[in-house]
Amino acid sequence: MSEQNNTEMTFQIQRIYTKDISFEAPNAPHVFQKDWQPEVKLDLDTASTQLADDVYEVVLRVTVTASLGEETAFLCEVQQGGIFSIAGIEGTQMAHCLGAYCPNILFPYARECITSMVSRGTFPQLNLAPVNFDALFMNYLQQQAGEGTEEHQDA
């Protein structure tokens, strides 16, 4: 057997850290006197960078915007980072690991940070629902495949 066939998949968390946080309440204090029926918008984004052989940084960016009508009550952004050792996988499996599995690990940390900042801003508690990063990753792959098909049709 070749050495490649004996390569076992390994995954290890080296570090989880807060890379950047931001909280803005541009319409405070008068926003506190309004009836609290916000429209809450959640945006997610991930990025990964190879730091060394089998070592990757994954950053999950979570942005929450709460609006009352046309006014922004608060805007909260967290970039939660992680450094992971990943070996023994390639291609689509590696893309899935970096684009779904690692963000799944990082999300609870980002959610806790956002909840804390919103609370410190004296807004009512914000509970973010769990996110299915596997489904988001599959949607991303389908979009990429669709764009590739369209490019071939245009050629």
From Swiss-Prot:
The keyword NADP does not apply. It is found in: Cytoplasm. It holds the Pfam family SecB. One of its GO terms (biological process) is protein folding. Keywords: Chaperone, Cytoplasm, Protein transport, Translocation, Transport. HAMAP family: SecB (MF_00821). Homotetramer, a dimer of dimers. One homotetramer interacts with 1 SecA dimer. One of the proteins required for the normal export of preproteins out of the cell cytoplasm. It is a molecular chaperone that binds to a subset of precursor proteins, maintaining them in a translocation-competent state. It also specifically binds to its receptor SecA. This is Protein-export protein SecB. It comes from Escherichia coli O1:K1 / APEC. The lineage of its organism: Bacteria, Pseudomonadati, Pseudomonadota, Gammaproteobacteria, Enterobacterales. The gene is secB.
